[in-house]
A protein has these predicted regions:
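Basic amphipathic alpha-helical segments that dock to polyanions
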Residues: 49-56
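Beta-hairpin "wing" of winged helix-turn-helix
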Residues: 57-75
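Accessory beta->alpha helical hairpin/"wing" motif in late/C-terminal subdomains of nucleic-acid enzymes
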Residues: 82-86
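Short, Lys/Arg-enriched N-terminal segment that forms or immediately precedes the first helix
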Residues: 1-5
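Amphipathic alpha-helical dimerization/coiled-coil segments
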Residues: 87-116
C-alpha cells in the first residue's frame, strides 16, 4: 500500500528517539533500523538524519559520543543514546500520538461506516 511519505516528516525526531529506546546506535545503524521497521517503505536521507540528530542533541534529548573501539571494522563512529529529557520527550509524544489516533479514528470510522 502506498502512502504519502510527507506525513512522516513531522515525526522524524520521534521516530529517531523511538529507535534509540532499544540501544545506542550510530547514524547508519539508525537509518537501517528505521528502514527495516517500515518494511523498506521509508528510507531516511542521510542529510535529514544528521540534521535531526544534531537538533535532538542540541535539545538535550540525545547524547552523542565517539566509539573508539578497534573492532568496528572501520573508522570512529559517533553513537547516540537517549537522555532522561529524551525519554520524557518520547513519553509526551506517545501520549500526544495516542490522543491524535483516537481523534482520527473517530473520523475514519464514521466515514467507513457511511460508505458501507
Amino acid at each position: 500500500m502506498e502512502f504519502q511519505k510527507e506525513i512522516l516528516k513531522g515525526y522524524i525526531d520521534i521516530i529517531i528517539v523511538s529507535v534509540l529506546q532499544e540501544k545506542p546506535m550510530y547514524g547508519y545503524e539508525i537509518a537501517k533500523t528505521i528502514k527495516g521497521k517500515t518494511n523498506e517503505n521509508f528510507e531516511m536521507k542521510e542529510a535529514t538524519l544528521y540534521v535531526s540528530l544534531k537538533r535532538l542533541e542540541k535539545k538535550n534529548y540525545l547524547e552523542g559520543y565517539w566509539n573508539d573501539d578497534k573492532g568496528t571494522g572501520g573508522g570512529r563512529r559517533r553513537y547516540y543514546r537517549i537522555t532522561k529529557e529524551g525519554k520524557e520527550f518520547f513519553k509526551e509524544k506517545v501520549n500526544e500520538w495516542n490522543l491524535l489516533k483516537k481523534l482520527l479514528n473517530n473520523f475514519m470510522e464514521v466515514h467507513f461506516n457511511e460508505k458501507n
